[in-house]
From Swiss-Prot:
Protein name: Diaminobutyrate--2-oxoglutarate transaminase
Gene Ontology MF terms: diaminobutyrate-2-oxoglutarate transaminase activity; diaminobutyrate-pyruvate transaminase activity; pyridoxal phosphate binding; transaminase activity
Enzyme Commission number(s) of this protein: 2.6.1.76
InterPro entries to which the protein is assigned, alphabetical: Aminotrans_3, Aminotrans_3_PPA_site, Dat, Ectoine_EctB, PyrdxlP-dep_Trfase, PyrdxlP-dep_Trfase_major, PyrdxlP-dep_Trfase_small
Record keyword Membrane present: no
Cofactors, names only: pyridoxal 5'-phosphate
GO BP of this protein: ectoine biosynthetic process
Keyword terms, alphabetized: Aminotransferase, Pyridoxal phosphate, Transferase
Amino acid sequence: MDIFKHHESQVQSYANHFPVLFGTAKGSWLYSQQGDAYLDFLSGAGALNYGHNNAVLKQALLEYIERDGLTHGLDMHSEAKAHFIQALQTHILEPRGLNYKLQFTGPTGTNAVEAALKLARKVTGRHNVVTFTNGFHGCSLGALAATGNQHHRQGAGLALSGVYRVPYDGYAGVDGLTLFETMLQDNSSGLDKPAAVLLETVQGEGGLNVASDAWLQRVQAICRAQQILLIVDDIQAGCGRTGTFFSFEPSGIEPDMVTLSKSLSGYGLPMALVLFKPEWDQWKPGEHNGTFRGNNHAFVTATRALEAYWANQDFQTHIAARSEQVTQALLQCLSRYPTLFSGLKGRGLMQGLACHNGDIARDIAALCFQKGLIIETAGAEDEVLKVFCPLTITEADLAHGLTIIERVLLE
């Protein structure tokens, strides 16, 4: 462990909370070099929805590598990319009646957010962007400007501008959308008409805050009335995490742009994508690019994930069952320990318990780790204990992890 202490920057964070040298991982489990097993309720912060080393995805990747399939090709056409595009159309976009162009921005979610913001500003000719309290969109400067958390914002080293923040659904009891709509109509409000509104339907890092369907529909109505682009950041809440492939599906909205990353590749490989309506495809060739925007290994595993898990309703039924299992367990904790918890947060398999303060949540997470459960906190003060297991987790493994939480609370 000394090699990390001596040579790696202290900017690392997860390693501080989980100070173990990991060697292997399979499904919902990680194993240390000493052979200790840890159940994963973190899932690579949402990058491992299909679990560690998923056998179906691994086999597809190994076969592709074995036949010397193209690894790196910038944005050139490749067989792997063609198969992914077709799978996305067949299993995701067409069944949902969605018509989007695809831009591969690679390799991370913040790259997708930056590209979406840049394109929105280009096509509207406006610079301002509206985001929401407790939102998180990445740590590069444009995405960071749209992020609310001061811990991350203070790392910028310069002023973050071009963003106006509005209260999220339920924030401090404020009707943020009435405020937003009123300011748009008032020439003296000081609000420059925005190019776009950027939001998460469930705020992952912000504390598992959930926007209601009615609130999302109202946001879309405001955007359409004012010719403002609506961008949904589905980097953490997408790819099935809330129960449907896109987190916004239950609301019936149709964003102008959607950003995806994390579990898009299915295997934890770097991959990011912006979906946008065809009329917004106004880039000039090469106007926005990136060296690693064509990760063919990620295309291979992403394609296989779509074919294996999204060709029918079985996987969504599984997610719904496991989500209900989590909900019932957390509700029991909430009722039994009112001195620790103040509420249930999130939906789908991104749920958690709001603690009365961050110290409680951090202590519970630390004690869970001592008992073999990797779980993190979220929220402005790290006050939410965040259950974020792989979507493929078995009923038995999920019950085991929830039992560890209960044991910690009993102690």
